[in-house]
Design a protein with these regions (language model features):
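Gly/Pro/Ser/Thr-rich low-complexity, intrinsically disordered segments predominantly at protein N-termini
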Residues: 1-211
């Protein structure tokens, strides 16, 4: 049983984030990252349970529908065509944040696969990450966006499958209302520039990422 002392020490999620979680009807179970790992090790949380830790809450991940799966595959193909061996592309794998362990659809992290043999990438490792949104757009904008901005993740893409566009968020700002200072929208006929550490590696046509 988890003690209240452990729970109350955690950073508080924003009111808007909690409101979105409640509106989506997701169950709330606030715990620490360490407790979350213990539950996984003990088999209380199984891989097939499809959940992730957001602001100390265990949240059930939505079922991946075919358009979502297809978009992830397309994104990975495009990224791998641009990037060298010094960058790691991780698909639906955990990242380590202060009170969360989300599993973004795609993450570009510095280094090699061996660098993450005994740990998950953290904000300092992450070049940018991508969430594919077909049924999860509100959650990706209202919960995950401030989460990633507050952790200082430099760049966040939302691939909006239904609107046929990509939202690119940069220049994170922390504080009580974390957000990204800059937003760029790319529609189906556009190409999204892939900029890593201030260097443009190329661009990806939006249409090539859409199912």
């Amino acid at each position: 049983m988890y003690s209240a002392a452990h729970i109350t020490r955690q950073p508080k999620p924003t009111r808007a984030a909690i409101g979105t979680i409640l509106a989506l009807g997701r169950p709330l179970h606030r715990i620490t990252v360490e407790q979350y790992h213990t539950m996984q090790e003990q088999g209380t949380i199984r891989k097939e349970d499809r959940c992730e830790l957001i602001h100390g809450y265990i949240l059930e991940k939505p079922h991946i529908k075919p358009p979502h799966a297809s978009a992830i595959s397309r994104v990975m193909k495009q990224l791998l065509s641009l990037l060298g061996l010094e960058v790691v592309v991780r698909i639906q794998l955990p990242i380590a944040l202060s009170d969360s362990e989300p599993e973004p659809d795609a993450v570009l992290a510095e280094g090699s696969d061996e660098d993450y043999d005994d740990r998950h990438p953290g904000p300092a490792d992450i070049l940018f990450l991508i969430e594919v949104s077909d049924t999860s757009l509100d959650f990706d904008r209202e919960v995950k966006l401030p989460l990633y901005a507050g952790e200082g993740i430099a760049q966040y893409w939302i691939l909006d499958v239904n609107a046929r566009r990509v939202e690119v968020y940069t220049q994170p700002r922390g504080g009580k209302k974390p957000a990204y200072r800059k937003t760029a929208i790319f529609t189906r006929d556009d190409a999204v520039p892939v900029v890593v550490s201030g260097k443009k590696l190329g661009s990806i046509p939006v249409a090539s990422m859409l199912p």
